[in-house]
Structure formats: structure tokens, C-alpha cells
């Protein structure tokens, strides 16, 4: 069963067929980046985990 979501990071909109693929991508970003980039990835990751269907980095 798919759970599509949309992420908006650095102004770029990306459609994901599966929420958990997006979670994995942004989790990796949180673990490997620092500073403002890490904060952006964290914002999106938390929104994904909260069940939102459109998640931005702001």
C-alpha cells in the first residue's frame, strides 16, 4: 500500500510514491549534514513522521 507524500526542500518540490522512502532519504540527510542543511532536513523529517502529506523545510 503506497503512502504518497510531497516534500519541498530548497524550493524544489519532489513527489514520493512512498512516505518511508522519503523518511529514509531525509534521515540520511540529518545524519550526514550539519548547520542549516541539517536543520532543513530535520524539519522535513519531523513533518513526515507526524503524518503530514506535504512537508517543507520551513
Residues of each region from the PLM?
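Short, charged, amphipathic alpha-helical segments
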Residues: 38-46
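N-terminal acidic leader/helix
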Residues: 1-36, 53
Amino acid at each position: 500500500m503506497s503512502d504518497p507524500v510531497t516534500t519541498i526542500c530548497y524550493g524544489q518540490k519532489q513527489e514520493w510514491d512512498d512516505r518511508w522512502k522519503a523518511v529514509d532519504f531525509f534521515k540520511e540527510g540529518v545524519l550526514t549534514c550539519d548547520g542549516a542543511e541539517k536543520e532543513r532536513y530535520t524539519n522535513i523529517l519531523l513533518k513526515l513522521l507526524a503524518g503530514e502529506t506535504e512537508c517543507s523545510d520551513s
